[in-house]
Amino acid sequence: MDTPRHVYRHAELLRLFDPRTIALVGASPNPGSAAYLAMLNLRSFGGMVYPVNARHEQIDGKPCYRSLSALPHVPDCVVIAVGREAVEGIIEECAEIGVGGAVIFAAGYAETGKPDRTEQQARIASIARQRGLRVAGPNCVGLLNHASGLAMSFTPSLVLASGTAGAIGLVSQSGGVGNGLTQALHRGIALSHTLSTGNSCDVDCADCISYLAEDPRCKAIALVFEGVASTARLMEAGALAWANDKPLVIFKMGRAALGAEAALSHSGFVAGSNVAYMAAFERIGAIVVDRYEALIETAAFFAKAPPPKTQASGVAVVSASGGGRGSRGRRGRVERCAAAAHESRNPQPGGRAATGIRNGQESAGLDGLAARQPETARLHRNSSWRSRLRGRVRPPRLFVAGGFRQVRQAGRNVAPSRQAGSVELGIRMD
């Protein structure tokens, strides 16, 4: 059972996510092994790397050490690339010498559903938390810090190069899904981090969000996950993202019965009530996408969109041209408009929004925008929004309502909630 705690903050996770020295336990010269691939990926790292394996004297041109205790310096982070049975002893040694973080590749723990394997994972978590050692995994493919060129992962052919402007911090329980999403780099989308949590025996998705919320290199956060041990901790992390003006975009997997069953066998998490998660996401002002392929595109939009020039209230009009915007005003469709304050230039649309971006082809594809009355629309996820909007609105290819900063301004004196996560719009729907 997960012990109640607050999310880990940026300073507590720095040695895990942004280390200066790394030890690779189980380092191997055998091509194709996870340890060999991890060693290759660490070549781009600018800090010190210590291979650890008692069977070898040298690997990849570096002297190999017999144990962690034999290292000349205590590493910030230890990448553990050995079999499951040897992991617990290495974690104990990490804690003993004062290592800051550890990444565990090995699988076969709680995700198997076997009591002894679940207990083994719990012991690792207990050691880590008692000694202040932050652990990613087990059953984790690793961590990427694109900003520093760090790849603690056994995934082959990794792409690390990334721009810095409008960079997204990507958090995924599934390493395979996370690695797939990093292909967005080929399309010019910038990433600051790709963080895989696996079984999350210690560090989980909420902690990753907390870290990215306070990292200046990250401009927006994209989360894809199956379930979490503590919804309260996820909401705490979401509140931190809100407070630091970092839009949080979420795709929740395992929403159907079959998907929930797959989630349990994949990462060891019960997917949980979709209704409960949606309520939590709404309360923290998160942007929820219904399709996996929309996650990165939506996060990229919010990462690149500059804040409004002023704190003017009213309606944001998104149009392909100034003439189109003026036409809407002349026809009396817009009752109150602050379009001048929110004007943006292609290709980076302006005006961050707390929710409500259209990715589909029809009005039924609008995600996050619900019609509260014929005269006004409210940024509020509601089961009846499709029927209320259908036939009344013919939205453009991209529709953004409200402004992320305006939402924060409206709820500055209250915790993120429905009240703070809503913006009144004055658009006639007839």
Regions from the language model: what does each represent?
Residues 1-430:
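Catalytic-core regions of core metabolic enzymes
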